[in-house]
Regions:
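Short, surface-exposed ligand- or partner-binding patches at beta-edge/loop junctions that are enriched
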Residues: 99
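Short, polar loop motifs at secondary-structure junctions
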Residues: 58-63
């Protein structure tokens, strides 16, 4: 009986594995720290629909100059003093859609900003994932 039940559970688990969303289309996942991570398409769609949204690129100035999302503001997360000074001037009533190169810096920025009372969303995989999906950048 146990073998039948385990086999049934395994079959159900395997059959649902292929039901995940296409790359770039999944919407939300929240790691244990509560930061909401959005796939690139969901990220930009939600940012466009959100009248309080601000796109925030937390890469270096050099990286930003090489290409960024249209309309994004830049604050360098790797320069802690400048980053802290920059976020101290931001409006906490706005919603911030944050990205970096691959997702590590943006996640750290989201954690820091969320602790300070900002509403934030992180883009999954950063601009590398964005461009891999053929989505446009501005120079």
């Amino acid at each position: 009986m146990k073998k039948i039940l385990l086999s049934l559970l395994a079959a159900v688990g395997l059959s649902t594995t292929g039901c995940s969303a296409q790359a770039g289309q999944s919407s939300k996942s929240a790691p244990s720290d509560g930061i909401i991570v959005l796939a690139p398409q969901a990220f930009i769609d939600q940012a466009k629909a959100d009248t309080t949204s601000i796109l925030l690129d937390v890469r270096t100035s050099k990286e930003y100059a090489e290409g960024h999302l249209a309309g994004a503001q830049q604050l360098d997360y790797l320069n802690p003093e400048a980053f802290d000074a920059g976020i101290s001037k931001l409006d906490k009533s706005r919603t911030y859609y944050i990205y970096c190169r691959s997702g590590k810096r943006s996640h750290g920025a989201c954690q820091k900003m969320q602790k300070q009372g900002f509403k934030v969303y992180d883009m999954e995989g950063g601009i590398l994932n964005w461009t891999k999906l053929g989505m446009p950048v501005e120079i």
